[in-house]
């Protein structure tokens, strides 16, 4: 507030802003920090008295649907409760098929990160030998679209029971330009944590499409690269660890608001991207460029395998050559490469994980008392079509949704259907599914 605002007073207690620590402005009214604290005490007393009043009246307290439900705070993991890398990988195996090397890298990095947090939460137990500072190791996941980058990060957050937020790097721009500020990433995490700052400071943020903020050119340009190098520069401090000011309503539409301060030192950042063309950069570095000729007998699958093998050998210098600035690469020391999904892996994704797509649709139809079956040829045909679409596991849901649309439209209105069978012909020709009706619903010879 300016020096001309010394006359401002709290609308509730009448104290001037000089008499209180904080005066919060609203539309035509003001409230001081002391009144806010008093309101919190009153609400806490009412919440504590409600169960007692209900017991005295012989009944249970009626839920007040108008009051927002506060999520119970997560119990923080002690050192002994942190799952070991083998346990983390085993849990990931239940939800994500393949990508064993990436799972190992993630499991070790996440285990070490939360060991670091448990050490920081026990300052009283330090000895003279414990003054070694453990630095944060953010993670970079490289792999084609639909290979499981986001799912891996999301599953990690589930096993650790920490807040998790996903951000899209393509929407970010430097401050002052059209687009989102980098602080909006922290705002998403804060919202997931129900505005609990301490909880948010232990969370995981996954920044997708990170390769899209690569520099447009290796040479400095006269024009400002506000969505490329500029965003990388803006993310540097956040990745390393800083006290960031986060506007709770978004900074650009509500510029005059009190910001929430978040320490990003203990937030784990996982960045993911396809990095299309990085394999060629690695190939040039290794001196194995094939002068533009294609070897006879090369198939799309063998080309993808070669590209995936090259991505496994990526080094920080390759990322700099690709367009990431050295300072940014240095703040993401852990790198893992995901392999493209082949036909057999897509088949496994359809049927094996705990929440496999086939199991999800079987559960949906079971609620309508219908047994859903996919024969083996149908599953393979779905995987083959998904492989041709080149969008990884994401294509599977789209294909199954197309197949099941008519079935899910008709079945809720029919009580005579007992079983639904999806065949290869239905997948390839989009023909009608085979429906088996209850024997009791069949016409009898007398009625026929």
Swiss-Prot record:
Keywords: ATP-binding, Chaperone, Metal-binding, Nucleotide-binding, Zinc
GO molecular function, one term: ATP hydrolysis activity
Domain ClpX-type ZB: 1-51
Keyword Iron-sulfur: no
GO biological process, one term: cell division
This protein's record includes keyword Chloroplast: no
InterPro entries xref list: AAA+_ATPase, ATP-dep_Clp_protease_ClpX, ATPase_AAA_core, Clp_ATPase_C, Clp_protease_ATP-bd_su_ClpX, ClpX_bact, P-loop_NTPase, Znf_CppX_C4
Chain positions covered by the region annotation Disordered: 53-79
Subunit-level organization: Component of the ClpX-ClpP complex. Forms a hexameric ring that, in the presence of ATP, binds to fourteen ClpP subunits assembled into a disk-like structure with a central cavity, resembling the structure of eukaryotic proteasomes.
Record-given protein name: ATP-dependent Clp protease ATP-binding subunit ClpX
Natural source organism: Rippkaea orientalis (strain PCC 8801 / RF-1) (Cyanothece sp. (strain PCC 8801))
Recorded name of the encoding gene: clpX
């Amino acid at each position: 507030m300016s020096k001309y605002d010394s006359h401002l007073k709290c609308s509730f207690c009448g104290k001037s802003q000089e008499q209180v620590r904080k005066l919060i402005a609203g539309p035509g009214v003001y409230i001081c920090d002391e009144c806010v604290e008093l309101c919190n005490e009153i609400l806490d007393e009412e919440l504590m008295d409600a169960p007692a009043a209900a017991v005295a009246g012989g009944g249970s307290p009626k839920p007040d649907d108008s009051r927002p439900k506060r999520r119970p705070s997560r119990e923080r993991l002690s050192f002994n409760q942190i799952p070991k890398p083998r346990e983390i990988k085993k849990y990931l195996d239940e939800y994500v098929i393949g990508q064993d090397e990436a799972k190992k890298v993630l499991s070790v990095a996440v285990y070490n990160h939360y060991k670091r947090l448990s050490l920081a939460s026990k300052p009283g137990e330090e000895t003279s030998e414990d003054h070694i500072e453990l630095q944060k190791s953010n993670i970079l996941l490289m792999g084609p679209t639909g290979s499981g980058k986001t799912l891996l990060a999301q599953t990690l957050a589930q096993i650790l029971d920490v807040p998790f937020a996903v951000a899209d790097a393509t929407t970010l721009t430097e401050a002052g330009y059209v687009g989102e500020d980098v602080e909006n990433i922290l705002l998403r995490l804060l919202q997931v944590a129900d505005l609990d700052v301490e909880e948010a400071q232990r969370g995981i943020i996954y920044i997708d499409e990170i390769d899209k903020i690569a520099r447009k050119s290796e040479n400095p340009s006269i024009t400002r690269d506000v969505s490329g190098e500029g965003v990388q520069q803006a993310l540097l401090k956040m990745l390393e660890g800083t006290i960031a000011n986060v506007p709770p309503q978004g900074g650009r539409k509500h510029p005059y608001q009190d910001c929430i301060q978040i320490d990003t030192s203990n937030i784990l950042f996982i960045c993911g991207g396809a990095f299309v063309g990085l394999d060629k950069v690695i190939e040039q570095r290794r001196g194995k460029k094939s002068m533009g000729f294609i070897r006879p007998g090369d198939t799309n699958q063998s080309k993808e395998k070669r590209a995936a093998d090259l991505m496994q050998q990526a080094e920080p210098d390759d990322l700099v050559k690709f367009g990431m600035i050295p300072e940014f690469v240095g703040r993401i020391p852990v790198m893992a490469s995901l392999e493209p999904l082949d036909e057999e892996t897509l088949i496994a994704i359809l049927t094996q994980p705990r929440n496999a797509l086939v199991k999800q649709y079987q559960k949906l139809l079971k609620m309508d008392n219908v047994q859903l079956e996919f024969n083996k040829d149908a599953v393979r045909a779905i995987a083959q079509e998904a492989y041709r679409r080149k969008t990884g596991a994401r294509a599977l849901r789209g294909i199954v949704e197309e197949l099941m649309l008519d079935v899910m439209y008709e079945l809720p209105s029919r009580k005579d259907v007992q079983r639904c069978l999806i065949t290869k012909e239905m997948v390839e020709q989009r023909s009608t599914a085979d429906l088996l009706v209850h024997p009791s619903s069949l016409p009898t010879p007398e009625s026929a």
